[in-house]
Structures are given as C-alpha cells and as structure tokens.
C-alpha cells in the first residue's frame, strides 16, 4: 500500500495465464509517469515479498528488471552487478546481518531462522552463504539438499492450488489497488465510459 501511495503500480500475474517461476518471479518497468512492479502469483508468498523489495530497489535506481530462476537470491551468482545489488538490498531488509550472530549455521539453524523470519529455507541459505555464515565444506551439500526440497515444495503447492478461485478477486489482485482505484475514479468522474472502464479492469466496473 505504501508503494502505491507513492504512485508505484503493484500487481500480479493473471491466475488463468500461469507463468513458471523459473521464467519470471518479478518484473519492474521503469517509467517516471507510471512505474509498474509485477509479481508472479504462482510463487510462494515469502518469495513474492523478496521479489517486491528487489524490484522496489530497481525503482529507486530507475533500472528495469526481470528477475527469474529458482536461485536468483544467490548474490554470488553470475548475474550482473545491478541484480546482485538489488538482491543484497532485499536480503538485508528481510534478514539483517546484525541479527545473525552465530559463526556458522547448519541445516537446523537455517530452518530455525526461516521459521522465525517467515522466509524460505533457500533464501536463508543464500543469505547466510553471502555473508560467510555457511561453512565452505558444507555449502555444496546444503545447497543441493535445500534446492531439492524447494523444488519439491513448489510442485506440491502447484498440485494443491485451486486453479480456479474467485475470478473477480483474482483480477482485482492482479490489477493492483492503485490501478483499480484510478480506473474506478475515472469512470465515476465520467472521464471514461462503462465499456472502457470494464475493459481496462477485465471485469465489470460495478464489481469494484
């Protein structure tokens, strides 16, 4: 809501047009008049939060972005400097280094932190690895194990997810509050007609 108050449009992908998280987790379109952040509805909530902050960092740096891949949170990954910077901004805000007091963390420690901060195990692992809190000799095995569990969890969520849902609620969520409000106000002020407003919203303007 605070981002939208600042004039940043925040929406999500459409539920009936699924985009794999491996292809896109978050998207930022830089525009001085109407900047857009789009999150992938298919992603886990904790991952959407990370993606939102990551894309918000792009907003302040005025750099467009498409974030993807299962391990894009790894700040040491072979990606460009801009992406690494935005990853680190999001990581520090969500899991401050000052709170991570142990010298090294094992899998139990990773899971404990993930539970406390309501973040995914893979995010916590990469955060700890980035600041040198994962023992070098254990990093490879831990990464493989947690990545495997992460992929299995994603598949489980996909099987359990209700692919239908409430169409109007899903579309409101996809459009974002700011977009819905602007279209509805324009209709109520007679600046656009009923057909145009409903076409923009992808549902009847009366449903707002």
Language-model-detected regions and their locations in the chain:
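Active-site hotspot residues in diverse enzymes, especially metal/ion-binding acidic/histidine motifs
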Residues: 1-208
